[in-house]
A protein has these predicted regions:
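C-terminal substrate-binding/catalytic lobe of Rossmann-fold NAD(P)-dependent oxidoreductases
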Residues: 7-124
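Rossmann-fold NAD(P)-binding glycine/threonine-rich loop
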Residues: 1-2
Length: 124
């Protein structure tokens, strides 16, 4: 919804995880980027900005990964407009939040017919 309401704003996604995480960007960062692309179909994902020169293009969605220490997981979606910035952030301070989500998903799935389900189905 933010991508739709703030359609003239630049979007950058930043995710941070511990130094043992092997994938980059994280699945959650990719999910956020794909949600933006559903609204802004012309979006072009830019993974980092190293070596890029020139002005930022309107359709760019920057995706950045940070790895260090024992960061469990942090995700930020930055909407940068003229003279204002809106950020949506989520920080997981322990892996318990993921375990709770997995348990909730299992409880949902046990009552469903065989098939493929996603978070939208569960959150309904």
């Amino acid at each position: 919804e933010a991508a739709k309401a703030l359609n003239k704003f630049d979007i950058e996604i930043i995710e941070k995880h511990h130094n043992k995480k092997v994938d980059s960007p994280s699945g959650t960062a990719v999910m956020i980027a794909n949600a933006v692309k559903e609204i802004r179909e012309q979006s072009e994902f830019i993974y980092g900005r190293h070596g890029r020169t020139g002005k930022r293009q309107q359709n760019e969605v920057g995706i950045h990964a940070v790895r260090g220490g024992t960061i469990v997981g942090e995700h930020s979606a930055i909407f940068a407009g003229n003279d204002e910035i809106l950020e949506i952030n989520h920080s997981a301070r322990s892996k318990n939040v993921f375990a709770e989500g997995a348990i909730a998903a299992a409880k949902y799935l046990v009552n469903q017919e065989s098939g493929f389900y996603n978070m939208d189905d569960m959150l309904g």
